[in-house]
Curated annotation (Swiss-Prot):
This is Putative uncharacterized protein YCL021W. It comes from Saccharomyces cerevisiae (strain ATCC 204508 / S288c) (Baker's yeast).
Length: 117
């Protein structure tokens, strides 16, 4: 099952007109907590995370506290797989993590996706 989660660490620059306004955020986000509720969790199942980095010149960025995150930590808590860290941001010039595609290897359906600050 393919799930596309739109994530922004800060507001997208107005110059990126191809991004729908509904996908933009006006506030900064320092930490993400992604909850994927499962009907049943199997330790043999795993999630592959693919991150698309969109480079935006520093002059076009808003000033926010962007934290470089270096790994994925997944845990099972009452049938909920919690991903609390994401793949690394390039060290040369940290980009905005805009879209994350999570490919679930199991056939379990996710009833909802919550993005929490």
């Amino acid at each position: 099952m393919m799930i596309i989660i739109f994530i922004e660490l800060c507001r997208i620059a107005d110059s990126l007109l191809w991004i729908p306004k509904s996908s933009r955020r006006t506030s900064s986000i320092s930490t993400y907590l992604i909850l994927l509720p499962y009907k049943k969790w199997n330790p043999n199942n795993y999630i592959k995370i693919h991150v698309l980095f969109i480079w935006i010149p520093k002059s076009s960025r808003r000033i926010y506290n962007i934290v470089c995150i270096h790994n994925i930590i997944a845990s099972n808590d009452n049938g909920i797989l919690t991903i609390i860290k994401l793949p690394p941001v390039p060290q040369k010039d940290p980009c905005i993590i805009f879209i994350i595609t999570a490919l679930l290897t199991s056939n379990h359906e996710c009833s909802q996706i919550n993005l929490l600050e």
